[in-house]
Design a protein with these regions (language model features):
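N-terminal active-site segment of His-dependent metallophosphoesterases
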Residues: 1-59, 77
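Active-site neighborhood of phospho(di)ester-bond hydrolases with catalytic His/Asp-centered motifs
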Residues: 6-8, 35-40, 64-71, 113, ...
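Alpha/beta-hydrolase fold active-site loops
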Residues: 2, 107, 145-147
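Glycine-rich phosphate-binding loop signature in dinucleotide/nucleotide-binding domains
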Residues: 27-31, 139-144
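Extended active-site neighborhood of metal-dependent phosphoesterases/phosphodiesterases
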Residues: 51-143
Length: 147
């Protein structure tokens, strides 16, 4: 059986140590095959917050990791960074792929980035993203759970 651990809205920068410890213990107990960090990894997309998030992931030691940014993972107040390099701090911690894919014999997880640097709320999907996901789902193996 495949085990997936999804963590959403961690908001590093406002994290509570007891919650972090509980998550680490849960991960140790469950030994997930995949950890998904699904947006709002940080509170304000600051470099220090991404460093803390990366340190947390390093402590988890996941077998596999899939991350996608949330609206809190692009700068809100640093307008220059938001306009010209909105994902730079995210990419430094988690790589440049904003829409990663995880695939195994019985699992397909498609990461979809709904953030837009020009707006800080109400994520959206483009027609190209919808088509890309639909196409990939059509090509999934019958044995794969699709997420």
């Amino acid at each position: 059986m495949t085990t997936l651990l999804q963590i959403s809205d961690a908001h590093f920068g406002t994290e509570q140590p007891p919650v972090v410890q509980a998550l680490l213990q849960l991960a140790r107990d469950q030994a997930p095959d995949l950890v998904v960090m699904s947006g709002d990894i940080t509170q304000r997309a600051r470099r220090s917050q991404f460093k803390a998030a990366r340190a947390f992931i390093d402590r988890l030691k996941p077998a596999a990791l899939l991350t996608i940014p949330g609206n809190h993972d692009i700068p809100l107040f640093n307008l220059a960074l938001r306009a010209f390099a909105p994902y730079s701090n995210y990419s430094r911690a988690f790589g440049k792929n904003l829409e990663p894919l995880f695939e195994s014999a019985n699992l397909l997880v498609i990461g979809v980035n709904t953030t837009r640097p020009y707006k800080h709320v109400d994520g959206e999907l483009s027609p190209q993203q919808i088509e890309r996901v639909a196409d990939r789902l059509r090509r999934a193996a019958p044995s794969q759970l699709r997420i």
